[in-house]
Amino acid sequence: GFGSLFKFLGKKVLKTVAKQAAKKQME
């Protein structure tokens, strides 16, 4: 349903944000 799709997108966004944050900390 719509709820599961929203959850899936939320997880994807969180992963992307986490990756970019890790990159910034490495610099």
Swiss-Prot record:
One of its GO terms (biological process) is defense response to bacterium. The keyword Secreted applies. The modification Glutamic acid 1-amide is found at E27. It is found in: Secreted. GO terms for molecular function: toxin activity. One of its GO terms (cellular component) is extracellular region. Its main location: secreted. Belongs to the cationic peptide 04 (cupiennin) family. 03 subfamily. This is Cupiennin-3b. It comes from Cupiennius salei.
